[in-house]
Amino acid sequence: MSRYEKLLHMLMDYDSTIMFTAIGDTSGNILWNTIRDDSKVQVPLPEIKKTLVRESNDWISRCKIEDSDDLGRALYHIASFEKIKQVTIPLDAFHLLMVYVDNTPLKKTKTKSYGRYVEMGKIMSIVDFVNTFEE
């Protein structure tokens, strides 16, 4: 099992709200993925491929911003939708990690709910841990 496959399995084991994980290249090819079978929301694969290409281009723009040293290095990007949160993390110059998290509110509230909290510290710790291993 490659370190990228280990990463995907560790993320799925870590949090039951993670519905889908994938590692893709900058051309939109999905190289590895895991899907939670009991997920209520299914993200269409063609949409994920389009998103990978779009996010790859966005990371190029973010890298130009970080070259200015004012903000520092970009770590991850979160796009929030009513049903999911989409997290994108660059693994290296050629691979992106995509994590789709269930965004259904935890409980019905009288005030408007904007979904679930994504524990990026823990997700990034898993990414860093797996990246310490050699292929």
Which residues does each PLM region occupy?
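Non-catalytic interaction/Regulatory regions outside core domains
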Residues: 1-135
